[in-house]
Amino acid sequence: MRTQLFSAVIAVIASAATLGLTASPASAQTFRAEIHGGWDHVGDDVNADGLTYGIGAGVDFRLAPRVNAGLEANLDFSTADKCGTSVLAAGDALCIDARRDLSAVARVGYEVSSNGQVYALAGYTNGRFRIDYDPANGPAVRTHENLDGLRLGAGYQHGFGNGLYSKIEYRYSNYELGAERHQVIAGLGIAF
């Protein structure tokens, strides 16, 4: 099931790239780079809240008079960490510490005004987490896990002129092993 999901995500990203590569000269591409940050919530057996911050870069293509498609990559870090007791067994302790998150997504936007667009996104994400587990009656274990997942999201991007823009975005990530992430971020960037 997960293999089919990742195959579908790769197909969507490849299709968006193909659309951009075959765009007519009148629908030139726009490159962009940004910084962003906001709220991060990671949940599974232990829920952790914190801040996320990072950078992103992408390219957008005009598909129709008010419709854009794009590809973007992000590198984010998180301060979300939390410990819980009696999570898997009585007296145990489980701590989760969210680390970096890499993502590659495709997005489709619709211009709601001359300066603003709403958009939806979907793609691949890979989160790194540090997990500490103390079973209370045995040796403690520390491990770092890289978890693959699916990212979905939606947002609004507003241009201020001279290529400057801001955005607000909601992201949902569903990783292997049942881990989930919810993020609300704001970003500032430049398109060129």
Annotate each PLM feature.
Residues T3, T22-F192:
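Gram-negative outer-membrane beta-barrel domains
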Residues M1, S15-A17, S27:
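Terminal low-complexity, poorly structured segments
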